[in-house]
Amino acid sequence: MVDQIGRDGELIHDVDTRLSNGRKDDLLLTALPGAVVETFAGERVVRYRDQIILKKQITHLGNPWPAFKKRIQIPKRWLTVEARARAEGLVVRFVGIYNYRDVTIFVDFDPSTYVLRKANNSAAHVATNDLHQAQVVGQFSRVDRNGNHLTSVRDDELSRYLLGGVAPEDPRLEVFRRFNAELLDGCEIAALEAVQDMHAAGWPDRFQAEWPGFYLEYRFDAFVRAGSMLHLVEFQKDKRRGRYDFDLVFRSRLSVDYYGDLKASDIVKHESPGNDADDIRRCVEEYGRFWYVIYEHTTKHSRDNGDVATIAWNEWRRSVGHKGRKEFDPLSYARKFKESVRFQRMMILEVNAANFEVVLGSFRQGQQPDGAERALKVMINKRYIDNFLIYTEPEPIRLV
């Protein structure tokens, strides 16, 4: 069984389908009034105005790959067609066709990566979430982990898309784009400088040992407040009764559209701890989606530099009146304390009904002091990012 998408964007487990060449042509001709089938540079294509459409069916990669991984095969002869069309001033599209029952989605793969590859066949990949997004919102564009650009388009939107009618972007993405311009500046952030900034602002978690995540929260909260952006995104530090216990509230005017969580993660880690699985599931069921906004950083540990930063941090906490539960120890948290971090990359991951079970690998996080098991948590597995990636910055470098 593989992932399939239903009419409302829901996930269905079923066998893969197979389309004949004639059926693929019919699906394109139905979506593009005025298009014709013709032969161009020896290849059967669909011609739509000044555009040459080369098409393949989107299918699952096969075992042992996860059910969400899909692709089209790009034959080497497409490169000849692309070169000829470009020489004649025509636009070439490498299009994948997904069809399941009454759902048809087209995926436009930017040819620029694939024309540079020397192999006889290349694979262009797409994930279940790309299909879900297109079915729900009409058009969805992203850059995958290898730097490839792809746009998924519902069948009733294809003509508008090919003629330049791009769907408007979610305005909340611009909030993060502007924040990234400040945070992802390549500068190293020293621990003592960060905690002193939080202390000056009265930030509640200024004394916490895992300071990078709390510093990220502090910076983002200050940014959206200073920029009067709370009507789009609010950082929810003080959780209120009756509301979900998540960091981010995404709004449309006074109403809540959905929730999210803001996380800092070491760039070398393959996974990032998430939230209670039941809470995420309820949130997705109520609002349709949940966003994880992850900022990855490189790390310098104090233990690799004589614990100087650890001692300075502990001394500073004592100097401003902080009293721990144990007797003062200048080497408290020495094994894990981060001397500095450099935020280098951010990504927005969407959890929804089509990827909930795959995007998050569940795990049990030990036991309570009384021996009872802790609530089931979720783990963000970075290997599966392409099945829930909404936005990333900076864009990955293309692999040729």
Segments the model singles out, each with a brief description of its role:
Residues 2-244, 254-258, 264-400:
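Nucleic-acid endonuclease domains
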Residues 247-251:
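Short glycine-biased active-site loop of nucleotidyltransferases that positions the nucleotide triphosphate
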